[in-house]
Amino acid sequence: MSAIREKVNISERRACRLVGLSRSVLHYDAKPDHENEVLAARLVELAHERRRFGYRRLHALVEREGTHANHKRIYRLYREAGLAVRRRRKRQGVMIEREQLALPGAPNEVWSIDFVMDALSNGRRVKCLTVVDDFTKEAVDIVVDHGISGLYVARALDRAARFRGYPKAVRTDQGPEFTSRALDQWAYANGVTLKLIQAGKPTQNAYIESFNGKFRDECLNEHWFTTLAHARAVIAAWRQDYNEQRPHSALNYLAPSEFAAKHRATADAPAAFQELV
């Protein structure tokens, strides 16, 4: 409007009349929506607590708290607050064809296991054995130590099985710990099939590779461990949060434990119905 007035040298009243605009509309000062202010403040708070979460996971968290908002609205507030997650630079590698893994139909059908390396502040190496249920996406265990042998792996899997039963199969790469006699004997004794992926084809173990990426990005890269005990405590807390709170995109943004509980309830329903009949 000011541009029109300057160009033809007329009053504000006449300019408004010529373009059919009310002067009250011209001077209307939009008041910020209190609901949006509260929601934006909560998004900022959650983003500071979970620095590596994008707007989709933050949306899932506020929905879980009872705040129902369209994802477009969440994205707008997220961008306006300058909360876009800075992507870490990935190493350039050779392009390889991804292979689609068959999704198991129930918990404990297939566990995937792998190692993730890190270091303490003094430079000493830390080795993390990650164990994931391919169906529920639960982090069954994350074992942290300076060294982990094949026998150590077998004992760790035994410990996990005490709480949730033995898996039908375990998928691994061909690392020496996973091709050891100790793990082979453990699998035979417990009726577990060992599924070894082909050498040089990590995409055949895509579920654990995806988990390891999240583990490194959201936990290992966010902390500076001073001792082995410190590393174990932080990683255990992250694993619990991952299982019980973190929205998982492959599970329609349910947390893995929440998804597993809903699956158990659904699976138990037919049996309960039969008992009533």
Curated annotation (Swiss-Prot):
Paired cysteines (S-S): none
Domain of life, per lineage: Bacteria
InterPro entries, per database record: HTH-like_dom, Integrase_cat-core, RNaseH-like_sf, RNaseH_sf, Transpos_IS3
Name under which the protein is recorded: Insertion element IS407 uncharacterized 31.7 kDa protein
Pfam families associated with the record: HTH_21, rve_3
Molecular function via GO: nucleic acid binding
Record carries keyword Mitochondrion: no
GO process annotations (BP): DNA integration
Residue stretches making up the Integrase catalytic domain: 103-264
Keywords: Transposable element
Gene3D superfamilies associated with the record: Ribonuclease H-like superfamily/Ribonuclease H (3.30.420.10)
